[in-house]
């Protein structure tokens, strides 16, 4: 069955475009019905980021859940990993995060978590999706069985304590000057407070949300302001979260960005040395740099690759028993602590290493030199350009040229008629020639099919 609503990270789209109050109401009803098992009183935790449309979607979801007899616990603006954690700790049947993650304010989304704090399986999402297109009027609760909604106090403190417990109790961040960029998003209150409680000298930016400025020229997808602030304040480290704080990138004391691949390298190596790796392996996606794979191999650590998307990384981790995984974009999953990506918890592990080693971030977090990587997109109108004989030949020729010295990844986008061509290797000029050859062949095939 093709999926009309759910993508790789819940339901996401333009607010009042795809994401309407009507859809949110229906999602609340369908998800509420899907998770009402047993005779106990059922309840759902709902959190959100700071987008203007969050109010609209939150109220519609509340109406949907309460109409099928579910009680609603509202926690307000909170990081996605906090909502996942609270869903489990508050013994809820379901968790919901209203967010479009790193997108700008015009978009919004609905992420769903099961009772243990994990994102829903494909099968459960399909079950909910089927109900979205049918009438649920006959399944609504009777008047005396409707749900109630209440706002929960103290949830910020719960997440702060949870995050602090991922570090040794005796560890202090005293002496570290930290610039934190919360992307004007969900973490704008809790993360600066947590860093202060741990003893850091905290300088905060991206902590003045107005409903419109989430991820706007700030956060993990736009770290330029953070880089400048780190240099200006002569800070030891910068931390950039995205709008819902499930991804992170760091900035060293020189103002240089440290991406998710470098974070996987430093955490993987450090945890292996400390005997904390569950197995000698790290899970990443097909987009992670070949330099990471080579570095880990030199440390006796395998790199397992999955399709793009943190849900696939987590699935592989749970299936094979690995406890470190993530994406180059900064989704870092440490399954000893979390059931989903947690940007702040990942950053704390690196801060702990910096304190332990007594060395600057530029030394701690630069474990390998990334190979030159080139990514180009080819748009097409119709047909199947990847089946064209000229394209197949160009790909085969490219693989021969890069054999042993690089790799190719050619994949169609899951959301638009675009084919992404990524190449990386030791020689940038060769990689560029190979990628351009494939792009030209795809362009010719697309033009012929138009």
From Swiss-Prot:
The active site is at 101 (phosphoserine intermediate). One of its GO terms (biological process) is UDP-N-acetylglucosamine biosynthetic process. It catalyses: alpha-D-glucosamine 1-phosphate = D-glucosamine 6-phosphate. Its EC number is 5.4.2.10. One of its GO terms (cellular component) is cytosol. Activated by phosphorylation. CDD domains: GlmM (cd05802). Its cofactor is Mg(2+). Binds 1 Mg(2+) ion per subunit. Keywords: Isomerase, Magnesium, Metal-binding, Phosphoprotein. One of its GO terms (molecular function) is phosphoglucosamine mutase activity. Pfam families: PGM_PMM_I, PGM_PMM_II, PGM_PMM_III, PGM_PMM_IV. Mg(2+) binds at residues 101, 242, 244, 246. It is an enzyme of class 5 (isomerase). InterPro entries: A-D-PHexomutase_a/b/a-I, A-D-PHexomutase_a/b/a-I/II/III, A-D-PHexomutase_a/b/a-II, A-D-PHexomutase_a/b/a-III, A-D-PHexomutase_C, A-D-PHexomutase_C_sf, Alpha-D-phosphohexomutase_SF, GlmM_bact. The modification Phosphoserine is found at residue 101. Catalyzes the conversion of glucosamine-6-phosphate to glucosamine-1-phosphate. Belongs to the phosphohexose mutase family. NCBIfam families: glmM (TIGR01455), PRK10887.1 (NF008139). This is Phosphoglucosamine mutase.
